[in-house]
């Protein structure tokens, strides 16, 4: 096989300079193709990191505004409900789409919200990361609804009550 290539090259009468020119083009093309593959992989990994960070931030804000001041178990339960809604029914695939779906969580309709901060924000971020990355076993599998104990929404009768944690009642 190699002798055929050599014979072909000799017929072209390009000599050593031609050989090196063609070799440089071939090697350069291969290098550019490989660089493109690795650059695409790096860009995809960066987009995935940004997507995950954005979803964790949305989940943390939801935990903060819905369950700040609740027992830790209640904050985890709110995060679980949020994650359970992802990809289900009227909700989309991203956590942010679930959190900001119209009417899904009361705080998203408020015009002025305090900037999250302090120890409560640190706890909310920790809870969000643990639930998002599934570092903790769910305590309310299948829970998709909850409400505060001081209200009785009409939809509550249609769903199975799972637990009361802090000032929230959770349903499947």
Question: Predicted segment positions?
Answer:
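Bacterial extracytoplasmic/cell-wall-associated proteins, especially those involved in peptidoglycan
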Residues: 2-9, 15-18, 36-172
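Hydrophobic membrane-insertion alpha-helices, especially the h-region
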Residues: 16-34
